[in-house]
């Protein structure tokens, strides 16, 4: 059954090489929704994944509910397995469970944290071969809720406009998970070098007034000092070395990544 990745992005030239080089091994096709990028993002996509579709968003900015509505509309035209991820998320694990049985998989996250900022990263190697610290969804409920599940499905799924018992909205984050054979490696706080700080700081320019008034996307309204404080006081103290856990998913990925 065909597998399609959706992703909305704005000026993500720093993270895109890792995101694209990983997912092109897994998905038959990708639909990249461009929120009017002014950097090399589109050029990078065309270079690494030349057969993928690039759509210019109908939305002028990152208004959370209209993002989800646009994703809903695009997904409704796609058959087979589909998932919408941010550029900071990488799906990895046992892809053999993506069979023809109709189902919705709620995929949890491993929250990666840059505890060793002195170790430089390179874009010609996967991030999972360079950074190994963070915290696991399975360790406790707080860790799971820090980055809730994504929906990977081959049945119709509607992203709600407001939060429900099942889903935190807007944003498409689900409040439970039903598999640990697949996970997303979440790199929103790793690496936190100059490129990592720059991408987090530029997102706030795309948060509209209506979302600010509704207290949506408030975590994007920030500065470098606040980001550094959160990294050092909120995330690093909770982190541990996850090399063993990451190797499990990476080895499974390497064994199965050609199963499309």
Language-model features: where?
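Active-site beta-to-alpha loop of glycosyltransferases that engages the nucleotide-sugar donor
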Residues: 2-21, 36
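Short beta-strand/loop segment that forms part of the nucleotide-sugar
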Residues: 28-36, 56-57
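Active-site-proximal specificity loops/subdomain of glycosyltransferases
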Residues: 4, 18, 40, 44-85
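Receiver (REC) domain switch/active-site residues of two-component response regulators
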Residues: 28, 50, 88
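A short acidic, amphipathic alpha-helical/loop segment
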Residues: 18-22, 44, 96-98
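Catalytic-site signature of metal-activated, phosphate-bearing donor transferases
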Residues: 64-73, 91-260
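Active-site acidic Asp-centered loop
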Residues: 35, 85-87
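Short, acidic, metal-binding catalytic loop of nucleotide-sugar glycosyltransferases
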Residues: 21-29
């Amino acid at each position: 059954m065909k597998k399609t990745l959706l992703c909305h992005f704005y000026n993500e030239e720093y993270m895109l090489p890792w995101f694209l080089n990983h997912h092109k091994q897994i998905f038959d096709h990708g639909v990249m929704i461009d929120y009017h990028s002014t950097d090399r993002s589109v050029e990078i996509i065309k270079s690494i994944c030349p057969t993928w579709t690039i759509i210019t968003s109908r939305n002028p900015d990152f208004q959370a509910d209209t993002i989800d509505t646009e994703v809903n509309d695009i997904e409704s035209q796609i058959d087979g397995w589909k998932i919408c991820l941010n550029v900071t998320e990488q799906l990895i694990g046992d892809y053999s469970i993506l069979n023809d049985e109709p189902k919705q998989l709620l995929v949890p996250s491993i929250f990666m944290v840059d505890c060793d900022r002195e170790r430089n990263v390179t874009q010609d190697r996967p991030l999972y071969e360079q950074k190994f610290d963070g915290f696991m969804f399975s360790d406790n409920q707080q860790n799971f809720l820090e980055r809730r599940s994504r929906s990977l499905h081959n049945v119709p799924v509607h992203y709600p406009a407001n939060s429900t018992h099942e889903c935190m909205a807007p944003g498409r984050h689900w409040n439970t998970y039903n598999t640990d054979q697949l996970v997303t490696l979440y790199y929103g706080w790793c690496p936190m070098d100059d490129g990592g700080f720059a991408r987090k700081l530029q997102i706030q320019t795309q948060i509209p007034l209506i979302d600010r008034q509704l207290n949506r996307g408030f975590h994007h309204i920030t500065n470098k000092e606040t980001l550094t404080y959160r990294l050092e006081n909120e995330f690093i103290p909770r982190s541990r070395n996850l090399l063993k856990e990451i190797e499990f998913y990476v080895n499974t990925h390497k064994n199965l990544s050609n199963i499309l």
